[in-house]
């Protein structure tokens, strides 16, 4: 078996094909505030929900929901840094149910609350 055949075999049997990764990411990122049922994204990729979830995790190292939450937090970080929008508005724009939900998830991923992160950024302290 050649190297290309081995790669194709791994993609077919373990993860998503490159076009499926691109399509899934594009669909999930189209509107971060929208609810993206995994079943619909899977259908666009021509897969069942369970197969899609397993293949997505193999391809990207994380389940689709967790990947989407991280993208939402990244977008919230950008909005916190680049706008003066309220944290509640940012939460809504990024697909969180409310400010409290954003704060819990943001703190779990970033290590500080959105308000503290914003204050520190504006004060010139950089938190990664």
Where are these regions (language model features)?
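Short hydrophobic/aromatic patch on the recognition helix
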Residues: 52, 56, 101-102, 106
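Short coil turns linking two alpha-helices in DNA-binding domains
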Residues: 48-49, 97-98
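An amphipathic alpha-helical interaction segment
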Residues: 1-26, 39-40, 44, 51
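Hydrophobic recognition helices of helix-based DNA-binding modules
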Residues: 1-3, 56, 80
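Terminal helix-turn-helix DNA-binding modules in bacterial transcription factors
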Residues: 22-30, 34-40, 58-97, 119-128
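A short beta-strand-loop micro-motif that forms or neighbors metal/cofactor-
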Residues: 31, 45-47
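…primarily DNA-binding HTH/wHTH and HhH modules…
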Residues: 104-128
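Core residues of bacterial helix-turn-helix
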Residues: 44-45, 94-95, 106
């Amino acid at each position: 078996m050649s190297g290309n055949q081995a790669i194709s075999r791994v993609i077919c049997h373990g993860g998503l094909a490159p076009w499926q990764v691109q399509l899934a990411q594009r669909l999930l990122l189209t509107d971060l505030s929208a609810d993206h049922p995994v079943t619909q994204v899977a259908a666009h990729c021509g897969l069942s929900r369970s197969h899609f979830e397993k293949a997505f995790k193999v391809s990207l190292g994380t389940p689709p929901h967790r990947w989407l939450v991280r993208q939402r937090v990244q977008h919230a970080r950008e909005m916190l840094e680049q706008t003066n929008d309220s944290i509640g508005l940012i939460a809504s724009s990024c697909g969180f149910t409310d400010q409290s939900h954003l704060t819990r998830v943001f703190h779990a991923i970033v290590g500080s609350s959105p308000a503290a992160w914003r204050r520190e950024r504006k004060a010139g302290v950089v938190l990664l």
